[in-house]
């Protein structure tokens, strides 16, 4: 049931005036670089897929994992939670940006020709479908399966009297004191409802005159969402071993609403949740102190306008209309689902100590190049012998990249450590190493990107801690986010100076390095060392260098560098055939890069894309993309590496940049060429595994639909499992 469908046409109408992925970060208002008009090319107008709908398709693939009975049960619950968190961020940033464009009258059409209003309408329809499916996967599949394993998520009606008595004591002692029922009447205005909070909308009736009044009760966000009952239900000896029962907190509060409203009759109560605009605008050019400006904007973010209202499907029309009016939410922004709201809380269930219901434990191995070297100089000695390519999480981050930085901090011959920090872990060994380096008298420089979305507050804390320890902290370039993953170590060796470098695709975060798939290059190559020296000078000083020896650096060099190499691959293919371009990345959106791949396809070059998330390229269309093949791999680890290969010109590149406007135009990004044949062979093996016809994946069709592959009845291999087995083998 979608009661708000009656109003969807209001969004779709063109009468009113006319960015993230899960960390997409695109500017919500600024227009992207214009694609080459179709009239100036032999390419059709409809050659792009909509990026917003493509992102929703990505999240639908995450949901498909939750619905996969072959996966361990608690992993399926985790994917339900990831789906919910992903969708929250999408609305807080991407949908919020489209709404702002629409409200400001900026009717800039997307690359596929849609106005902001039309995109909002399509997003609402698509979201309602997948949100309903999300709820049904939980209700009809995951929750019953959990119950079969002794993990029961119950309702108040399922409880016996002993359990209700137990919860009555818990509620009175632990929950009731922190609840604040907020009435709405002439003396009490409608309360502020914070974004992503879970709430109960309550209608009460006065017993004296029968007058009805609305009140809101916020479900506390500093207690567990699921209340665990202290004892299993009575049963035969051994029958309940391992059985746990959980009651959602909102059900507990609802059961005791009479205690919150004594003397009043509870007429009805319903759960609801709103999402607010969390996209920030910091006027960097006008603010001398970026850190203070960002802190002011962070304080404002919690008061952003609502962009989504989630309700349970049993909410009455009258209650819904009241919420729409008081919260100033458009009916088309209502998402109505059966069952529980905010399934991101299922992470609490995932954290149960039930290893049999999770993926088998995986412990990363130390890279062979570092396995037998334990002295403080071992990493440097290894890199003097040759470059090393690490592939996380299969190669341990802590015994490679982290050890590289820690040994640099402890080595008396190291003179300087310069590093970019975009997202780092809560108790970061990388940050501690930089502090130790500064305290030891080394020149320690940290470029902390305090504008990393949803990590701003944490990065501000780290920036201040680093500054207090004597680390030189800079915040990058005005108007640009610094997203590159680079570290430069300067070491005195005899009478000479040698530079050691790390360039990666992932963050310097020891926790996510166990969950994210990334690659990194550790090298003592002089040309890369010189390039990183120039790069850090541009980040910390007034250097405006835009060309490098062995790097492509955005915002000036990556788009042009990639397109130029596509053209060289085309020319080489025309000369001797065998043209092939392979790309692995998180997102492919940039129209100019996409058009260059279309030209390669038209020339007969085979183009293979492995993309985790958004893909605006339309493959498999006769005349311009019949030689392009796109697939998506999702699994236990988040596929995060960015790798590009041009076969005929024999170049492999790795780095931080996806092919998106934000990466190529509004960020400092770095791609590095990997030249060592032993290392390029490793990257080639990675591509061959990902592109193997039997690899479990989704394939993108010319109609924009993603289809599971291989088809039923064919041999199926898991790319990530194969890599784990390969790294475990001697």
Curated annotation (Swiss-Prot):
Q: Name one GO molecular function term.
A: polyphosphate kinase activity
Superkingdom field: Bacteria
Entry keywords, A to Z: ATP-binding, Kinase, Magnesium, Metal-binding, Nucleotide-binding, Phosphoprotein, Transferase
Q: Which reaction does it catalyse?
A: [phosphate](n) + ATP = [phosphate](n+1) + ADP
Query: Which annotated residues bind Mg(2+)?
Result: 423, 453
| Record GO biological process | polyphosphate biosynthetic process
Binding of ATP occurs at 86, 516, 612, 640
- Enzymatic class: transferase
What's noted about post-translational modification? Answer: An intermediate of this reaction is the autophosphorylated ppk in which a phosphate is covalently linked to a histidine residue through a N-P bond.
EC number(s) stated in the UniProt entry for this protein: 2.7.4.1
For whether the record's keyword set contains Ribosomal protein, the answer is: no
One Pfam family of this protein, by short name? Answer: PP_kinase_N
Where is region (Disordered) located? 1-39
The keyword ATP-binding is assigned to this record: yes
Instruction: State the needed cofactors, names only.
Output: Mg(2+)
Secretion signal span? none
Q: Which sites are catalytic?
A: 483 (phosphohistidine intermediate)
Q: What cellular component GO annotations does this protein have?
A: polyphosphate kinase complex
Compositionally biased intervals (Basic and acidic residues): 1-21
NCBIfam families listed in its UniProt record: poly_P_kin, PRK05443.1-1, PRK05443.1-2, PRK05443.2-2, PRK05443.2-3
Homology family: Belongs to the polyphosphate kinase 1 (PPK1) family.
Q: What does this protein do?
A: Catalyzes the reversible transfer of the terminal phosphate of ATP to form a long-chain polyphosphate (polyP).
Q: What is this protein called?
A: Polyphosphate kinase
Organism equals Mycobacterium avium (strain 104)
